[in-house]
């Protein structure tokens, strides 16, 4: 196996949407960084039964509806 080709694998702190924190190993950032989640298993529609509204991050949902809205109504 080649040396120095793999990313650094270190501990980071992950903060869930409800403020719960846990430590895990990741290649994200650097040792001790914090990753704050916008959506997690407790709030994602796939795991909550789809009762929450989809967040329109950066207008992506709006652009999709504008582009493909006619197909969705069909």
Curated annotation (Swiss-Prot):
MF (Gene Ontology): rRNA binding; structural constituent of ribosome
InterPro entries recorded: Ribosomal_bL28/bL31-like_sf (IPR034704), Ribosomal_bL31 (IPR002150), Ribosomal_bL31_A (IPR027491), Ribosomal_bL31_sf (IPR042105)
Pfam family, any one: Ribosomal_L31
Domain of life of the organism encoding this protein: Bacteria
Lipid biosynthesis listed as a keyword: no
UniProt keyword list: Ribonucleoprotein, Ribosomal protein, RNA-binding, rRNA-binding
Gene3D superfamilies: Ribosomal protein L31
GO cellular component: ribonucleoprotein complex; ribosome
Keyword NAD found: no
GO terms under biological process: translation
Function of the molecule: Binds the 23S rRNA.
HAMAP family: Ribosomal_bL31_1
Assembly and oligomerization: Part of the 50S ribosomal subunit.
Protein family per UniProt: Belongs to the bacterial ribosomal protein bL31 family. Type A subfamily.
NCBIfam families for this protein: L31, PRK00528.1
Name of this protein: Large ribosomal subunit protein bL31
Lineage: Bacteria, Pseudomonadati, Pseudomonadota, Alphaproteobacteria, Hyphomicrobiales
Gene name in the database record: rpmE
């Amino acid at each position: 196996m080649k040396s120095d080709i793999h990313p650094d694998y270190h501990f980071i702190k992950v903060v869930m949407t409800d403020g719960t924190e846990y430590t895990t190993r990741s290649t994200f950032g650097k040792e001790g960084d914090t990753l704050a989640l916008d959506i997690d298993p407790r709030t994602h529609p796939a795991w909550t039964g789809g009762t929450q509204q989809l967040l329109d991050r950066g207008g992506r949902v709006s652009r999709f509806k504008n582009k493909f809205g006619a197909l969705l109504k069909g």
